[in-house]
Every structure is written in structure tokens, then in C-alpha cells.
Amino acid sequence: MSYAAAFLAVASRHGERITLERNGEVLGTGLALLRPIYDRRGQFRPTDLGLERREQVLCMAQADLPLEPAPGRTLIRCKEGVYRVVNVRRVTAGLELVYWRAILEREVEGL
């Protein structure tokens, strides 16, 4: 069993189905583990009405998804809502892509 297959087995048991979009075009669907990031600094940003909390999530998505960094607005849709991809990195074991690690930020509805 490869590392990617082992990750996919964990994601199929504990993860959820997501849809990956870039610039309004659906690129694929797959499984991912999504976990909130609570202890990260900088989750509050100033607005005209005071401080606003940015909800950030750690996403570990299956290797089959085309999540590589690219120009444009990349979104992940899941049952909890819509998230914008802030940062994405490959997690590899040797030359094998095991999964994608991404930091997501919740999108505000209507923007």
C-alpha cells in the first residue's frame, strides 16, 4: 500500500467530500480532512466596524485533486461552506505525492 493510498483510506473514514473550483470552473471532487485552526496569530483584522475574525482551516486533500498553485481564485466547497485557498503545499514521501496541505479562509457570502 502506498502512502497516498493509506492517506486516502484515512480520509475516506474521517474526511468529507469537497469540490475544488478555480475561477468558477469545477476542477474536481475528492476527499479531504478539514480542521479549524484556533491557535494561529493574526486571525483578527481591522474593519470599519471594529475587529473581524478570519476563520482559517487546515485542509489535507487527496493527491488526485489538481490543487497546485495557479493564478486565479481557488475555492473549496464542502458541507460547512465555501473556503478560499490561501496557501497550498505538496506533502511527499520520496517522489510520491501523498496529499495536499492547504490553509483555507472562509468566504463571506455575497462577496
Q: Where do the PLM segments sit?
A:
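Active-site-proximal polar cores
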Residues: 1-26
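Short, conserved turn/kink motifs that form compact alpha/beta structural patches or helix kinks used as
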Residues: 22-111
